[in-house]
Design a protein with these regions (language model features):
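Acidic, glycine/GT-rich loop-and beta-edge segments that sit at the periphery of enzyme/chaperone cores
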Residues: 219-306, 316
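Gly/Thr-rich phosphate-binding beta-strand-loop-beta motif of the actin/hexokinase/Hsp70
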Residues: 1, 95-138, 315-336
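Early-domain small/polar-rich strand-loop-helix modules and first-structured segments
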Residues: 1-16, 73, 81-85, 90-93, ...
């Protein structure tokens, strides 16, 4: 057989894979790989009984979302049962499923594969819901080492790496209250961390392993299917999450009220809304953007140019919102008229709003 590595990267780049002179679609090969991997579970869980599946990858770019949707489509699983989240959200989901004492303060992950990467989860307990943020820092100076075959040289290399990591720990954690640290990645399996581990373990809980993201993906899927009471108390504002609530002012029982359309904390690539409203007057539809990060509340207006003039509250509108990126949404509005008295004009308006 021919070994093909880095299928996910190849699929993300859209590069054809050459095998014995034949060109193959990398997404098709990735789909086959996932299907065969799921097939290994066949003795325990037949694919027909899989209720939901979560993919977790390092970065969920629009291109990667498209790749994963194509993979999911090739698995003969219902799209509604397939979700995606990046590694940071898997870290968040994993953390929230630990004992509270482990995330009483900040939680840090050091990931060491090609180069060292640090992620720090912090929570603002004074908001409702509680807002969770995750910061990232890369340390290119701590690249994976190629160990010498000569014993003394190898020992010296490991001591140097240990000293380098020890310095990074002291610098990166100097101004933080950290409850727990997770060490993940193959680089930590190479038996070089001595003094750095002693530094790390002073006043902190430290764990090492390689299944944090996969377990976090499972926890994340469970919460999407049936959110726990604890989960509802938090909102994670990651890079691919809406940072603001989107709503409209509406009349309910004669009183002005807020009508929620999109919720902050939702993944942009899974976020859309469809609903109908009655336009009371005028020729604009207005959306209210409320940042959870404490910024100024903003209004976004969509102009309904050429909408038929009708009596007050005699125009029914169909509204569709769909996120196209983390801070932009496409809005499509259609005139539905108002029964037999005022038939639909067939007009529709499209606009892009910034959130």
């Amino acid at each position: 057989g021919i070994l093909v590595e880095d299928l996910l990267t190849l699929a993300d780049r859209g590069e054809e894979v050459m095998v014995e002179g034949n060109a193959y679609d990398p997404v098709a090969l990735l789909t086959l790989f996932v299907k065969r991997s799921l097939g290994l579970l066949g003795m325990h869980v037949p694919m027909a009984k899989i209720e939901a599946i979560m993919f977790t990858v390092e970065d969920l770019t629009p291109r990667m979302v498209d790749v994963l949707l194509r993979v999911a489509g090739g698995l003969s699983l219902e799209k509604a049962n397939v979700s995606f989240q990046n590694h940071l959200e898997s870290f968040y989901a994993y953390t929230l499923h630990q004992n509270k004492e482990l995330y009483q303060n900040d939680v840090v992950v050091y990931e060491y594969n090609s180069a060292l990467k640090m992620m720090c989860l912090s929570c603002n307990e004074h908001t409702t819901p509680k807002v969770v943020l995750i910061g990232q820092q890369e340390y290119e100076q701590m690249l994976r080492r190629v160990w010498s075959t000569e014993e003394e040289t190898c020992k010296s290399q490991k001591e140097d790496l240990d000293e380098l990591f020890d310095g990074i720990i002291k610098e990166s954690l100097a101004d933080r209250q950290v409850s727990t640290v997770f060490l993940i990645g193959d680089g930590f399996k190479e038996d070089w961390a001595r003094e750095s581990l002693r530094t790390l373990c002073r006043g902190r809980r430290v764990f090492q392993g390689n299944n944090l993201y996969s377990k976090g993906a499972c926890y994340g899927m469970l919460e999407r299917l049936s959110p726990s009471e604890k989960w509802k108390q938090y909102v994670y504002l990651g890079e691919d999450k809406l940072k603001s609530n989107v709503g409209m002012r509406a009349l309910r029982n004669g009183q002005e009220a807020y009508f929620a359309v999109l919720d902050a904390g939702s993944s942009w690539y899974e976020t859309s809304a469809d609903y109908e409203v009655i336009l009371e007057s005028g020729d604009t539809v207005e959306f209210i953007i409320t940042p959870l990060t404490g910024g100024k509340v903003m209004d976004r207006k969509v102009q309904l140019t050429g909408i038929p003039q009708r009596p007050r509250a005699a125009t029914r509108l169909s509204v569709h919102l769909e996120m196209t990126s983390v801070n932009q949404a496409n809005v499509t509005i259609e005139d539905l008229g108002f029964g037999e008295l005022f038939p639909s004009s067939g007009k529709a308006w499209s606009s892009t709003i910034t959130i």
